[in-house]
Amino acid sequence: MVLLSKFDFSGKESGKVELPDAFFAEGKEQSVKDYLVAIQANKRQWSACTRGRSEVSHSTRKPFRQKGTGNARQGCLAAPQFRGGGIVFGPKPKFDQHVRINKKERRAAIRLLLAQKIQTGKLIVADNSVFISSLNAPKTKEALRFLKECNVECRGVLFVDGLDHVGSNENLRLSVRNLAAVRGFTYGENINGYDIAAARNIVVSEKALELLVENLVSTTKD
């Protein structure tokens, strides 16, 4: 069992959070790499399409007569050497090239990424009150003070909240979105492995951490 400190909005420790040892079980680094590469690859639209010689709109006349001009003979304006002609061996959306990742592999990769952040001290747990009732109105100055009080490096910070609090955390979300140090604001079940890997620091609510442990550790036992 691993104990993590949780902090209130004043930056003081308000308790401990327990994490099972299974959350820190060893995983395959290659599976993490495959997962991150798949996320990046799937951002592509895979819709690039070009028209070949037989598809472009063109006149059927010869550019000029066959003989007597001194030029090389040409038969069609749709030939690729002419401006507006067809493309040779251009890209075609022949099939869906999206990369699929199994649910178990995805969860194992996210668990390993989060475990690495915890072990390197790049993840802090915030009390649920920080996300729900810490601010009566959006205040960027207060959000920045919270990060400094918790000794969080103000660079590439990712906030993660639990889904149960959607709407009630609006003041905090509006407060942090104007900070250059904040990478994003997301929810536990929508978390993306690439966001975890790219974030330098993660601030996660106690509720979101419970959801993540519940969803990720169950796959380790399978």
From Swiss-Prot:
GO terms for molecular function: rRNA binding; structural constituent of ribosome. Keywords: Ribonucleoprotein, Ribosomal protein, RNA-binding, rRNA-binding. Gene3D superfamilies: 3.40.1370.10. One of its GO terms (cellular component) is ribosome. One of its GO terms (biological process) is translation. Residues 50-72 are annotated as: Disordered. Pfam families: Ribosomal_L4. Coiled coil: none annotated. Belongs to the universal ribosomal protein uL4 family. One of the primary rRNA binding proteins, this protein initially binds near the 5'-end of the 23S rRNA. It is important during the early stages of 50S assembly. It makes multiple contacts with different domains of the 23S rRNA in the assembled 50S subunit and ribosome. Forms part of the polypeptide exit tunnel. NCBIfam families: rplD_bact (TIGR03953). PANTHER family: 50S RIBOSOMAL PROTEIN L4 (PTHR10746), LARGE RIBOSOMAL SUBUNIT PROTEIN UL4M (PTHR10746:SF6). Part of the 50S ribosomal subunit. HAMAP family: Ribosomal_uL4_B. This is Large ribosomal subunit protein uL4.
